[in-house]
Every structure is written in C-alpha cells, then in structure tokens.
Amino acid sequence: MSDQPVHTSELRPVLPFAFARAQQILLLQDESASAAEVVCVPETPALALLEVRRVAGVALTVSQVSPEEFERQLVMRYQRDSEEARRLMEDIGNDIDFYTLAEELPDSDDLLDGEDDAPIIRLINAMLTEAIKHKASDIHIETFERHLLIRFRIDGVLREILRPQRQLASLLVSRIKVMAKLDIAEKRVPQDGRMALRIGGRAIDVRVSTLPSNYGERVVLRLLDKNSVRLDLETLGMAEHHRRQLDTLIHRPHGIILVTGPTASGKSTTLYAALSPLNSAERNIMTVEDPIEYELEGIGQTQVNPKVDMTFARGLRAILRQDPDVVLVGEIRDGETAQIAVQASLTGHLVLSTLHTNSALGALSRLQDMGIEPFLLSTSLLGVLAQRLVRTLCPSCRQPYTIDHEQAEQTGLAAGTTLYHPGGCEKCNYSGYRGRTGIHELLLIDDTVRAAIHRGESELGIARMLGAKRVTIRQDGLDKVLAGITTWEEVVRVTKEE
C-alpha cells in the first residue's frame, strides 16, 4: 500500500461524490477518457472496484492509500471540481421546482443509481433560488430521527418549507460542505465556511455553519443578496427627524457613534449606510469586521481572524497607524477594544461601532462596565442609535380595524382609532407581511446628557432627566403602527424588554 499522494492534476473525478465517499474510491479520468486512475483504500469493496472498471471502460492504474490520505485527496479533488458544480447551478436558471425536485430525488443514501451528482446540485440550487425569491435571510437544514426539516427565515421569522425524505440529509450536507470548502470527514465539531454564487444573475454570498446534533449535522446558510441592498440612510425606514440628526452626527470630525440592538437587528446595515455619504476621495475610511458582509468600493476593509490572533483590538490598533479619517469597528466586545476606540475618537478620528444592548441608554452602562471612565465617555460619545426590525404589512392585503378599549389601554391610543392587521395574498405568500423596516431611538449626547454622564448619573436617572424629550423604540414603533406600516403586535414582539 502506498501513502504517497497521486500526482494526477490533469485528471478529474468521475464518480458521484456520495458514491466515492461511501465506497472510499476515486475514479480520475482526463477529458478524452483515454486515461484513468483509481485511488482507494485497502478496505474498498471488490464489487466497487469491479463497477468502477466497468464505468471507466479503459485500463486502470490502481493506487491504494491510507484512509487519511484518501480523505485528503477526496476533499481536494471534489473541492476543485465544485467549481463545475457552481457553473452547473448557474446554468440551470430559475425554471425549476424545489418541492418537485425534493420529491423526485432517488430514495438512496449515496445516489448510486444516478449517473452523476447533478440531482443533488439541482436541489441545492432550487433551494437557494426559492430562498432568494422569498427574500429569506437564512436556510436551516435540520435532521431528526424520522425526517429532514428545511426552514427559511423570512422577515425575521422561521417558516417550515419542506419535510423531505430523511435519506437526503447526508447527501445535502456533504455537497454543501464540499462547496463551502469544509472538511467533509469531520462531523464531530462545528465548522464555518462560505461560498459565492450567482443565481439568476444575482450575486449571492452564502455563509455556511455546521453543528453536530443527535441525528447528524445541522446546517445553517446565511444568505447575503448583494443586489438587493441599497446602503444609504434613506432606505432604513428611519423617521425624518432621526435621519437628519444621524446625518449631522456622521459629519462631525471626531467622536464615537454607536448602534445598539440584538443580533440580526440590522446594526451592520445601518453602519454601512452611515458610511455611504462619507465615502469620498478626500477621506480615508477603514473598517475591521467579523465578517465583512458587504464590499464597499473605496473603503479599506479588514476581516477579524481569531486563528491568527487578528482580533478587533489588534485590527483597530493597526488601522490607527494607517492615517484614517473614519474608522468602523464591527463590534465593541471587550474593554480593550472600547479603550482603543475611545482614545481614537479623542485623537481626531470619527469612530462608528455596535454594541449588544437593549436600549440607547444601556450603551452608557455597558461601556462603563467595560472600564471606560465617565469623564472619557462624556467627552468622546456623540450619539447612540438603538434599533429593531419589524415586519411591514403587505400593502396589497392589509385590513383596517378599530381598536377596542383593551388595546387602547395597551397602546395609549384612543378607543376607535383605526389601525391595520395582516391579511394574506399571493404577493406576500399569504403571510400578511412583506419586507421589514427599522424602528429606532436616537440618544444625542448634548451638553445636558454629557454633564449627567460626567457626574456619574445612572441610566434611570438620565431617563428621568430626559423625560418626554426621549422617544423610545416602542414609541417610534407606535408611530409606524399609526401610519399603517406595521402592527402593534410586531412592535411588542421586538420590544418586550421596554
């Protein structure tokens, strides 16, 4: 048995990926099919070798390697060949039915009955196409004891899409892992990867996350449709007075502007939109992000990489030696990053970043918990924008109604006020909602707030001091409810902590 790599760079894998992996045998042929080589392990079944000889139809050179070397070559060969798979996906187009494909795939764990991997590739393409059509942000592929479950996150809410045969699980996961350049042999630990695709002429960036579970790996695909995002402040659904105030803040020469909110509340999109009007030849704008979600022309973007100790803090330090005017830090996660960001803002830089807090005032406490002294915070902070995303009513089918006394008490509105609730039609896939918009609270650090921070006022104390001048996220949401943009139930769903 030889453990040496087989040097056959001009040869391509011929067998379906699932069959090659299950039987531990690689058949490599050139384009003319005049030369063929087999790579296998000592345990490869004799019947599999006989079948491969029949498929090849030419004399074979057989090399036996160790299981470890076989896995290495399997991954290398099919990762390289996955570029062909991507081209196949692009060529298929949109005239395929995801649900029909899932039902028609062979009832097999290895697609041995198929001539190639095209059916599973078509299924993945159809799944991605369906997700893009419904503007899904994530695809969840989950394996249970008796079935496979595929769910899409649409407008922030998970919806069950399909329960195909459980046998598809290993095929689907394995092919996705190959396309994302993950280790297909490793099923014991989580893995993260990405792939860039074009579907129906759209550039789609797909982040792939796998996680071991009771009945096999579960996969989540995060979809970034680069064609569907307009990165400017006008498209964020912000109230006009909030937009004007934020626009004033981002044109200040130095200081810190923060965007707060839970995961998936649109913080990164808001930061990108804030950079858009600043992006000019006269400014050096640099970012450190995890991950880089959108590539911005004319802006220097750096990816965090913990494997080589490239943290937010280290990246920020390096950026400050690059003569920046504006700095975007994807997230302030620790005291070290917070300290560097504050010092940068005090030395003539405009710094934009995010924090995981529930409210704008909560950012003040969070930064002080990270070790930022009140006198430094009051000097450096310009403003804090807190935000959530709510589903917007489908304008084609929303239904008016008048609120009763119970809802009048909940909302603070007069009984008999006309609001809207979701209907359901073909345009919104019968959900009643179509798209999302932001609801916001903007805390401006004016002289009064600055003095309160400096003397160590509590979060509650500053809230009382602001009184009616403070427009909370829930109040901003209520304005959108009155305008017929969303529902009171949506606002309550995303602001339960208020």
Swiss-Prot record:
Q: Which Gene3D superfamilies match?
A: 3.30.450.90, P-loop containing nucleotide triphosphate hydrolases (3.40.50.300), Type II secretion system, protein E, N-terminal domain (3.30.300.160)
- Which Gene Ontology CC terms are recorded? plasma membrane; type II protein secretion system complex
Determine if Plastid is one of this entry's keywords. no
Which example biological process does GO assign this protein? protein secretion by the type II secretion system
Q: What's its top-level EC category?
A: translocase
EC no.?
Answer: 7.4.2.8
Q: Which GO terms describe its molecular function?
A: ATP binding; ATP hydrolysis activity; metal ion binding; protein-exporting ATPase activity
Q: What SUPFAM superfamilies has UniProt attached to this entry?
A: EspE N-terminal domain-like (SSF160246), P-loop containing nucleoside triphosphate hydrolases (SSF52540)
Task: Show the CDD domains listed in the entry.
Answer: PulE-GspE-like
Localization (cell): Cell inner membrane
Residues noted as binding Zn(2+) in the record, renumbered to the chain: 394, 397, 425, 428
**InterPro entries per the record?**
GSPE_N1E, P-loop_NTPase, T2SS/T4SS_dom, T2SS_E_N_sf, T2SS_GspE
Q: Which domain of life is it from?
A: Bacteria
Instruction: Report the principal subcellular site.
Output: membrane
What catalytic activity is recorded? ATP + H2O + cellular proteinSide 1 = ADP + phosphate + cellular proteinSide 2
Required co-factor?
Zn(2+)
Q: Which UniProt keywords apply?
A: ATP-binding, Cell inner membrane, Cell membrane, Membrane, Metal-binding, Nucleotide-binding, Protein transport, Translocase, Transport, Zinc
UniProt similarity note: Belongs to the GSP E family.
* Entry function: ATPase component of the type II secretion system required for the energy-dependent secretion of extracellular factors such as proteases and toxins from the periplasm. Acts as a molecular motor to provide the energy that is required for assembly of the pseudopilus and the extrusion of substrates generated in the cytoplasm.
Q: How does it assemble?
A: Forms homooligomers; most probably hexamers. Interacts with OutL/GspL. Forms an inner membrane platform subcomplex with OutF/GspF, OutL/GspL and OutM/GspM.
What name does UniProt use for this protein? Type II secretion system protein E
To which species is this protein native?
Answer: Dickeya chrysanthemi
